[in-house]
UniProtKB/Swiss-Prot annotation:
PANTHER family on file: UNCHARACTERIZED PROTEIN YQGE, UPF0301 PROTEIN YQGE
One Gene Ontology cellular component: cytosol
Alphabetical list of Pfam families matching this protein: DUF179 (PF02622)
SUPFAM superfamilies: VC0467-like
InterPro entries to which the protein is assigned, alphabetical: AlgH-like
Stored HAMAP family: UPF0301
Protein's name according to its UniProt entry: UPF0301 protein Sfri_2850
Homology family: Belongs to the UPF0301 (AlgH) family.
Length: 186
């Protein structure tokens, strides 16, 4: 299977009543060792501004009014670790370029920049991540657990988390509710 890096996983309706119900996961890394991604549509119920205050990182007064972003649950693994998906900028301590439109940073310095003139233009803050061991994600896709689409900055950064699953499924070109989760063989 080709790498799914810079793609979205879209949870099939059969995942209802699970941790990943109606989730959209942005794949940050996918290779022969496994995969890592961030769920980008499940708010924790904490605003980024409040998270920054808890970390004793305070916003400049002129930016407080413009910061309206929710902290998301990135996944069930390492929920105490923070990750920021953002538009590219090169001056962070621990950043990885995922695509020409997206970088992943896990260092505190990017959080300190949010709400300042050094902040990335677009960003998503998540706690925890979703991970798959070697061949696990490929098997889940073969089992019709996930559908995939190429990620777009528009969907990643400009759609409200609560609307993302529906918007992502609409990009598939068919009604996801008409799909069967059963795998058939002719």
């Amino acid at each position: 299977m080709d790498s799914l890096k810079d793609h979205f996983l879209i949870a099939m309706p059969s995942l209802d009543d699970t941790f990943f119900e109606r989730s959209v996961i942005y794949i940050c890394e996918h290779d022969q060792k496994g995969a890592m991604g961030l769920m980008v549509n499940r708010p924790i119920g904490v605003e980024v501004e409040d998270l920054l205050e808890q970390m004793e990182l305070y916003l400049s007064p002129e930016f407080v009014f413009s910061l309206d972003s929710q902290v998301l649950i990135g996944g069930p693994v390492a929920p105490e670790r923070g990750f920021v998906l953002h538009t590219p900028q090169q001056h962070w301590v621990n950043s990885t370029e995922i695509s020409e439109d997206t970088m992943l940073t896990s260092s505190r310095d990017i959080l300190a920049s949010i709400g300042s003139d050094k902040s990335p233009e677009n960003f998503v803050v998540a706690l925890g991540y979703s991970g798959w061991s070697k061949d696990q994600l490929e098997q889940e896709i073969a089992d019709n657990t996930w559908l995939t689409i190429k990620a777009t900055p528009e969907l990643l950064f400009n759609v409200e988390p609560e609307q993302m699953w529906l918007m992502a499924t609409q990009q598939l070109g068919f009604d996801i509710w008409q799909m069967s989760s059963q795998v058939g063989h002719a």
